[in-house]
């Protein structure tokens, strides 16, 4: 071994630099592997939530039809998705909900939105998709904001789970009034309820249905989301952030 080589292997500064380079390379590789793992995991979880929404939408689990009213529980998987997958995941889950709602409108699965689709297809597409997409996105943002505040972290699951069905009702009805209130079809409901303004129409139209949806989603989604969030250990950077 030459003196130069011997000096290289015995020089503390050189050895320290080499050690730092090796550790840096290892850390970089580990970080890349973790990000890839969590990205894959995230996509699998998102796909599972989308599948649940689609299954519920085309079975009695998603829509319970009673005389004179239809109750939807699709806000439950949207709320859970928004909480455990973040705002982007919530947006995609909400969009999926909206697309299933549009399918119901086009095929006649929902008598009400089917009638609206025949009146104005473009407005109906907006009505069925935009409010549901915003619902998921906003629920995710609300949960993220509250969960980052330590003093209210524990209740963030419950607040987000309640906000989801409330946002669904508020956004859907606001869009309905903005786009269809002056149509003869909606005016028949206005006359039927005996109301004289859009606000009274919304209250009368939502009624018991909105209350049931809010309560059920609040209870079920908050329990499921908190349990899943804890079990899946969401503590590292991923698309949900």
What feature does the model see in each segment?
Residues 169-192:
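Juxtamembrane non-transmembrane "cap" segments at the membrane-aqueous interface
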Residues 123, 127, 195-216:
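Individual transmembrane alpha-helices with interfacial aromatic-anchor signatures
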Residues 24-93:
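Hydrophobic transmembrane alpha-helices
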Residues 147-170:
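Internal alpha-helical transmembrane segments of multi-pass membrane proteins
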